[in-house]
Amino acid sequence: MTDAKRAQKLDLSLDHKVADMSLADYGRKDLQLSEREMPGLMELIRKYGGTKPLKGLKVTGSLHMTIQTAMLIRTLYELGADIRWASCNIFSTQDHAAAAIAASGMAKVFAWKGETLEDYWWCTEMALTWPDGSGPDLLVDDGGDATLFIHKGVEVENDPSLLKKAYDNKEFQIIMDRLALAYEQDPGRWQRVAAKVRGVSEETTTGVHRLYQLEQEGKLLFPAINVNDAVTKSKFDNLYGCRESLADGIKRATDVMVAGKVVVVAGYGDVGKGCAQSMRGFGARVLVTEIDPICALQAAMEGYEVTTMEEAVRTGDIFVTATGNCNVITGAHMEAMKDEAIVCNIGHFDNEIDMHYLENTEGCVCLNIKPQVDKWTLRSGRSIIVLAEGRLVNLGCATGHPSFVMSASFTNQTLAQIELATNPDLERKVYTLPKKLDEEVARLHLDRLGVKLTRLSKDQADYIGVSPEGPFKPDHYRY
């Protein structure tokens, strides 16, 4: 049964809770190093730092507390925001980045690498709660956990009987315990918080799916901007970011030689495409599993073998899930794998790999090799190596995407926050950023790469029916 006594109480006297404040100077230096690689954010500071469109607004962030995110926080701060921040993954925080932001005073930070699930949801609620008990005006979300917490809070206040139930999912039970404590203290709190939220900008595919589900069900409580499907996010962060950070995570964790290995990539969306390119680039033979005939055909025509997971488990040396779905690699799949196959996930949540099977099946034994690297001996007698407990391998075992590609993503996030802050006419639905802004985000990053852009003549522009200033493609163009 749900029990408020299990939930750790909030401590609103805290300005931060991080692993080690002595890392702040290291974080500050690393932050300076990223500036040149994040031209989009630096330009937004120059453009909007004077007018401060976020002045007086409270912003909650639930997004990986990395050096790149520290630059996003700095940008929002320079635009006038009052910020509280938590990470959106228990393993993704870079402790020196969290310390640097906490020391700077730009945001109240509640994040450290290696949180428990109880810690994680405490940090999320701390980020959603100001010292006077009020909530945010704006949300920056990655995976939708801050949005989920508010929506579940309102749902519980409308139907307190939900708090009398027990839940099989451990993490969901932790959420409900926290909401039970909040309900005991103030049974109308989350309805007041939700009513004040001007909107959320959502960073990733999984969180966007949640938003569209809420919209379709008529349950979305405030406007939302889908940042993930901006071209300069999905076609860059998801593809080129994963192309570099996947290999970084696998190699830091295992020191494995990828060349000559068979790598199985589950899912061939933008993330899967980047993963497949990465592993092929290191000399692996890449197999792809897919449910979508279009993506499957794309993979086949790029030269990848497309097969089922049931077939792939027989030959794979390294497995990467990139689907955003659940139970992609099941217990039966793991039992059939080669001895010491490496299994990891680069989707947002930890349910793509059936960790519940490993943790709850008699005969499955875990040996921790080092942080975020576990050797599981299975009932078959063989072993597999699971990275980051099935959570994001690139952030759990490495430092995530490079600064340059995150500059494009976070420039979109900042523009979305400005839109939510300044447009009072937005309804309770999911919006996307206009093509003109997408092109501007790309334009801001060209000089850093030495790109020289060709300009249309008036005759050429008239011939194809566009302005010489853009936008150059219709909204339905897929890139």
Swiss-Prot record:
Please tell me where NAD(+) binds in this chain: 204-206, 238, 267-272, 290, 325, 346-348, 394
**Superkingdom, natural source:** Bacteria
Which Gene Ontology molecular function entries are recorded, alphabetically? Answer: adenosylhomocysteinase activity
Q: What class of enzyme is it?
A: hydrolase
Give the cofactor binding note: Binds 1 NAD(+) per subunit.
Cofactor(s) demanded:
NAD(+)
EC number annotated for this UniProt entry? 3.13.2.1
**Coiled-coil regions in this chain?**
none
> Reaction(s) catalyzed by this protein?
S-adenosyl-L-homocysteine + H2O = L-homocysteine + adenosine
User: Which UniProt key words apply to this protein?
Assistant: Cytoplasm, Hydrolase, NAD, One-carbon metabolism
Q: Which residues bind substrate?
A: 66, 142, 203, 233, 237
Write down the InterPro entries for this protein, in alphabetical order. Answer: Adenosylhomocyst_ase-like_sf, Adenosylhomocysteinase-like, Ado_hCys_hydrolase_NAD-bd, NAD(P)-bd_dom_sf, S-Ado-L-homoCys_hydrolase_CS
Gene Ontology terms describing biological process? L-homocysteine biosynthetic process; one-carbon metabolic process; S-adenosylmethionine cycle
GO cellular component term of the entry, any: cytosol
Q: Where in or outside the cell? A: Cytoplasm
Which pathway does it operate in?
Amino-acid biosynthesis; L-homocysteine biosynthesis; L-homocysteine from S-adenosyl-L-homocysteine: step 1/1
Question: What family does the Swiss-Prot or TrEMBL record give for this protein?
Answer: Belongs to the adenosylhomocysteinase family.
Q: Which NCBIfam families match?
A: ahcY, PRK05476.2-3
Q: What this chain does, per the record?
A: May play a key role in the regulation of the intracellular concentration of adenosylhomocysteine.
Put simply, this protein is called Adenosylhomocysteinase
Per UniProt, what is the name of the gene that codes for the protein in this document? ahcY
